[in-house]
From Swiss-Prot:
2-[(2R,5Z)-2-carboxy-4-methylthiazol-5(2H)-ylidene]ethyl phosphate binds at T131, S132, T133, G160, V180, S181. Pfam families: TMP-TENI. It comes from the Archaea. InterPro entries: Aldolase_TIM (IPR013785), ThiamineP_synth_sf (IPR036206), ThiamineP_synth_TenI (IPR022998), TMP_synthase (IPR034291). The gene is thiE. This is Thiamine-phosphate synthase. Its EC number is 2.5.1.3. It catalyses: 2-[(2R,5Z)-2-carboxy-4-methylthiazol-5(2H)-ylidene]ethyl phosphate + 4-amino-2-methyl-5-(diphosphooxymethyl)pyrimidine + 2 H(+) = thiamine phosphate + CO2 + diphosphate; 2-(2-carboxy-4-methylthiazol-5-yl)ethyl phosphate + 4-amino-2-methyl-5-(diphosphooxymethyl)pyrimidine + 2 H(+) = thiamine phosphate + CO2 + diphosphate; 4-methyl-5-(2-phosphooxyethyl)-thiazole + 4-amino-2-methyl-5-(diphosphooxymethyl)pyrimidine + H(+) = thiamine phosphate + diphosphate. Binds 1 Mg(2+) ion per subunit. GO terms for molecular function: magnesium ion binding; thiamine-phosphate diphosphorylase activity.
Amino acid sequence: MKLSGLYLVTKDYYNGNFFNIVEESLSAGVNILQYRDKTNPYNIKIEAGRRLKNLAYKYNVPFIVDDSPVLLDILDADGIHIGKDDPPFEYIKERFPGKIIGVSTYGDINLGIKYERLGADYIAFGSFFKTSTKDDAEMCDINILNNASKFNIPVFAIGGINTRNVDELLKYKISGIAVVSAIFDAANPGEATRTFLEKLRKIL
């Protein structure tokens, strides 16, 4: 399963155009979909997650859940993304063999090295720009991406990325970018997706 390109991370589920935005971006070419929801109760997350998984599979892209082994299990998602305050990598690796495990490595190259050795399927450095998605996001020096080519697993950039600043990241040998607001808050999510993909052709 290829892990590269444009990685869409959702906002928390909400009533309204949530699924329309996701499908519009998937139909425009998003390569990976992650369901990230920090606020809703599990019954809502499960219901929304099932619909998102169906959409991801409709467009033949991997479906990842954020930080929850419970959702990974119930939804039988393709994988999970974890950070420093989430369940331990080793537990997830043992409990869910064969699942994709992605790890946030912030601005710490040694974390990236550690998790590659432990068997992570991809890592994500960031935040590179101010982001409204995560108020307490640690800012990351863009020069860390000079090390991207040293890894044998995909390296993603994340955090405050939009169609105006993404070119700064594409100078480096990354595998892709992860975005939230740049698509969810776009006037035209499909057009924003296509703009990102056109720029990503430089590295794909």
